[in-house]
Amino acid sequence: DQPRSRGLGDVYKRQVRIHGKKDSKVKVFLISMDDKNTKILESTYAKLEENAQVKVYEYRLGGREVIANTKADLLGDKSDLEIESIYFAYDEDQLDIQYDMDHYGKESLSDLKINGAMKDRAFKKLSSTLDFKVGSSKSDGSEEENVILLSDEAKSLSVPVLLSGEDDVAGNHAASCGKLDEESIFYIMSRGLTRSEAESLVINSRFIGPIDQLDDETHKEKIWNKVKEIMG
């Protein structure tokens, strides 16, 4: 992590470098929870050797402007990268997030799962690229994003790209974006909950998987408290 620099609000810069060596197993947890005057610049790079298994968990809850880039080079055969990410954008937050997954090794695997929620006048752009290089035969890459919009003014943009220099690879993109299902909300409310409580229950169900991966109960509590604060 790099220190904050003062100016028109704070700027927080973070650079993360991950090296999954041969046959290694690595877990990384990246948490961003800053106030509304903070601009966040994130750069994450992962390099995976043969049979390396790397899991990255990301939590983005706050910051007036977030610019985040994650790049991974799956260099080794049977290298395996999993990324699970959650974000909650609100007020006038601006999120610009990019993922680049480059497959080089044979039978390499990448799996990107993103769950987001947006409210007020927040804006988010997500760019994701799966690139199967020549020599990455029998590899598999998957990218999935699910976004819940809690207001008409919130805007979500997704730009997926799939590139392939091999024939026998599998690349999948999936994205869903929309408001909460009214029938589901009505059903939950019929159990005695308010609408706000019903909405919170649905949002929490999307976030609970990555949050439960944290071993530190203090960090878990801080993240859940931040989600509750954003819901209002």
What are these regions (language model features)?
Residues G20-K22, L30, L48-E50, L74-G76, ...:
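Residues on the solvent-exposed faces and adjacent turns
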Residues H103-G232:
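Family-specific signature for flavin-dependent thymidylate synthase
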Residues R6, V26-L30, V54-E58, I83-E84, ...:
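Beta-strand-rich extracellular passenger or scaffold domains
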Residues D1-Y12:
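Single conserved hydrophobic/aromatic residue that forms the stacking wall/gate
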Residues D35-H103:
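Acidic, glycine-rich loop-and-beta core segments that form the ion-binding/anion-interacting portion
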